[in-house]
Amino acid sequence: MWRHTRKGDKYVTVIIDLTPVRDGTGPARLLDMVEGRSKQAFKTWLNERPKAWRDGVEVVAMDGFTGFKTAAAEEVPDAVAVMDPFHVVKLGGDALDRTRRRVQQQIHGHRGRKNDPLYRARRMLHTGSGLLTQRQIRRLDLLFADDRHVEVEATWGIYQRMIEAYREPDRATGKKKMAALIKSVSHGVPKALVEVAQLGRTLTKRAVDVLAYFDRPGTSNGPTEAINGRLEHLRGSALGFRNLTNYIARSLLETGGFRSQLLHPQIG
């Protein structure tokens, strides 16, 4: 989101070059920004690139929006689509949050309050099991000892398996763990776990893209999120932008990899 106004498109598609990260030559850099967040916006941008440039694209890392995947498949068909870990884990985290809120309503009849066990545990539930303190482990044991929380515990287990797959040092093993996870939620999920079933449908549909990450190091969208953070800071420092062209120009100057060249131009 580049502006907070009622009129006009509030969103832009941010296009990042991850090549320096993959090659170890530097940080990711902003390539361009396109008004709108749609298949057509990204497809048009790709179509406007020279054919030689498009033919050179090997990997496209993206979030879960299927419009980007379709656009890439049509304009750079030889490129491998990769759904990055940040957004895959976010899908799992969102499923966990929705389960927690639903169970909270079923038990207490209201949204979470500061003294409600599930509400108090909301951040702890998102912590990787390997990073939990002994005190947090005891709190979780107490939380899951309540049979009314069994659906939260089941969804939490899926979320933890997802994190474990990505944190596995051996990529081949990590890929096997993720494939097993996707298979386990693709069918036979209890009807009560509606959020897990929905997650399973999404992961099954994008399984090839999710698993592709383990074969291609350096294709995480993490650097993209880092650039998005810098752009958010830029908008705050400028007290907002009213003109998209100016916003794109300032963004390219800030994160397009030009600053070092402007500050330290080569002579001769």
Predicted features along the sequence, with ranges:
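RNase H-like nuclease fold core
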Residues: 1-61, 66-74
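Conserved beta-strand -> loop -> alpha-helix junction used to position metal-binding or nucleic-acid-contacting
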Residues: 63-66, 73-116, 225
